[in-house]
C-alpha cells in the first residue's frame, strides 16, 4: 500500500463512509473506487481533486507531502 491508498481508506472510515458512498459522490462505480483504494488503479487528476474536496484535505496531504 502507498501513503495515498492508506490515507484514502483512513479518511473514508473516519467519515463513516462506505466505498460505494464515496464512489457515488465522485460519480464513479464502486469497483473503480475500490481499485483506487487498493492501489490497483490511479484516479485521474479531476477525480483526485474531487476526492480531496470531498474528504476535506489537500492533495499534498493525500500524497504524504504534508
Spell out what each predicted region is.
Residues 17-35:
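Short alpha-helical DNA-recognition segment
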Residues 13, 24, 53:
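Alpha-helical residues within the helix-turn-helix
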Residues 1-14:
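A short, Lys/Arg-rich alpha-helix, primarily the initiator
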Residues 7, 18, 44-47, 58:
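Residues that mark the N-terminal boundary/hinge immediately upstream of a DNA-recognition element
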Residues 27, 46-61:
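DNA major-groove recognition helix of helix-turn-helix/homeodomain DNA-binding modules
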Residues 37, 55, 63-66:
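DNA major-groove recognition helix of helix-turn-helix
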Amino acid at each position: 500500500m502507498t501513503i495515498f491508498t492508506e490515507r484514502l481508506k483512513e479518511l473514508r472510515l473516519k467519515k463513516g463512509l462506505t466505498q460505494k458512498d464515496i464512489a457515488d459522490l465522485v460519480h464513479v462505480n464502486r469497483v473503480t473506487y475500490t481499485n483506487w483504494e487498493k492501489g490497483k488503479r490511479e484516479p485521474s487528476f479531476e477525480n483526485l481533486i474531487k476526492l480531496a474536496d470531498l474528504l476535506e484535505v489537500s492533495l499534498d496531504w493525500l500524497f504524504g507531502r504534508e
